[in-house]
Each structure stands twice: as C-alpha cells, then as structure tokens.
Amino acid sequence: QRWPSPK
C-alpha cells in the first residue's frame, strides 16, 4: 500500500 508523500 502506498500513500501521498509528506511533502
């Protein structure tokens, strides 16, 4: 599973 970067 992947999620949007914290940038």
UniProtKB/Swiss-Prot annotation:
Function: This peptide both inhibits the activity of the angiotensin-converting enzyme (ACE) and enhances the action of bradykinin by inhibiting the peptidases that inactivate it. It acts as an indirect hypotensive agent.
Keyword hit for Secreted: yes
Organ and tissue specificity: Expressed by the venom gland.
Alphabetical GO biological process terms: regulation of blood pressure
Any one of the GO CC terms: extracellular region
Positions where Pyrrolidone carboxylic acid occurs in the chain: 1
UniProt keyword annotations, A-Z: Hypotensive agent, Metalloenzyme inhibitor, Metalloprotease inhibitor, Protease inhibitor, Pyrrolidone carboxylic acid, Secreted, Toxin
Primary subcellular site in the record, as a coarse category: secreted
Protein name (Swiss-Prot/TrEMBL): Bradykinin-potentiating peptide 7c
Record localization: Secreted
GO molecular function, one term: toxin activity
